[in-house]
């Protein structure tokens, strides 16, 4: 049996920009992608702490060190600059893998710098 387990999480990312006319996705600072293990173009689940919106899209790379968390395309309607997001990916684990699996959790400061990495 396969179990869907949390693979990575960016906790309390702050929306820094939104571009309704961009073709879609969520731009994330490359440093945050690397720290969390989220890959460019990977499906992400996004939970807006401020308004309760929940949606899925895909991650694209933003400039390293920029703190970019930018809603693009239709997702730009799902939050406002300054809102806090939880960004999550999931992976399938077999029965043999599930007990040893640990997600990468990156806790963020309000300026999208890394506060702590929990593994």
Swiss-Prot record:
<protein>
    <recommendedName>
        <fullName>Aspartate 1-decarboxylase</fullName>
        <ecNumber>4.1.1.11</ecNumber>
    </recommendedName>
</protein>
<dbReference type="GO" id="GO:0015940">
    <property type="term" value="P:pantothenate biosynthetic process"/>
</dbReference>
<dbReference type="GO" id="GO:0006523">
    <property type="term" value="P:alanine biosynthetic process"/>
</dbReference>
<keyword id="KW-0566">Pantothenate biosynthesis</keyword>
<dbReference type="Pfam" id="PF02261">
    <property type="entry name" value="Asp_decarbox"/>
</dbReference>
<keyword id="KW-0210">Decarboxylase</keyword>
<dbReference type="GO" id="GO:0005829">
    <property type="term" value="C:cytosol"/>
</dbReference>
<comment type="pathway">
    <text>Cofactor biosynthesis; (R)-pantothenate biosynthesis; beta-alanine from L-aspartate: step 1/1.</text>
</comment>
<keyword id="KW-0456">Lyase</keyword>
<comment type="subunit">
    <text>Heterooctamer of four alpha and four beta subunits.</text>
</comment>
<feature type="binding site">
    <location>
        <position position="57"/>
    </location>
    <ligand>
        <name>substrate</name>
    </ligand>
</feature>
<keyword id="KW-0865">Zymogen</keyword>
<keyword id="KW-0963">Cytoplasm</keyword>
<feature type="active site" description="Proton donor">
    <location>
        <position position="58"/>
    </location>
</feature>
<comment type="similarity">
    <text>Belongs to the PanD family.</text>
</comment>
<feature type="binding site">
    <location>
        <begin position="73"/>
        <end position="75"/>
    </location>
    <ligand>
        <name>substrate</name>
    </ligand>
</feature>
<dbReference type="GO" id="GO:0004068">
    <property type="term" value="F:aspartate 1-decarboxylase activity"/>
</dbReference>
<keyword id="KW-0670">Pyruvate</keyword>
<feature type="active site" description="Schiff-base intermediate with substrate; via pyruvic acid">
    <location>
        <position position="25"/>
    </location>
</feature>
<dbReference type="InterPro" id="IPR009010">
    <property type="entry name" value="Asp_de-COase-like_dom_sf"/>
</dbReference>
<comment type="function">
    <text>Catalyzes the pyruvoyl-dependent decarboxylation of aspartate to produce beta-alanine.</text>
</comment>
<dbReference type="InterPro" id="IPR003190">
    <property type="entry name" value="Asp_decarbox"/>
</dbReference>
<keyword id="KW-0068">Autocatalytic cleavage</keyword>
<keyword id="KW-0704">Schiff base</keyword>
<feature type="modified residue" description="Pyruvic acid (Ser)">
    <location>
        <position position="25"/>
    </location>
</feature>
């Amino acid at each position: 049996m396969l179990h869907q387990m949390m693979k990575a999480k960016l906790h309390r990312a702050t929306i820094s920009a939104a571009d309704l006319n961009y073709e879609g996705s969520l731009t994330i600072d490359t440093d945050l992608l690397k720290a969390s293990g989220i890959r460019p173009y990977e499906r992400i689940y996004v939970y807006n702490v401020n308004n309760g919106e929940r949606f899925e899209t895909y991650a694209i790379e933003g400039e390293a060190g920029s703190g970019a968390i930018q809603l693009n395309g239709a997702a730009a309607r799902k939050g406002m600059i300054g809102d806090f997001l939880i960004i999550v990916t999931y992976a399938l684990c077999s029965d043999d893998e599930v007990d040893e699996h640990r997600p990468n959790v990156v806790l963020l400061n309000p300026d999208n710098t890394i506060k702590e990495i929990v593994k």
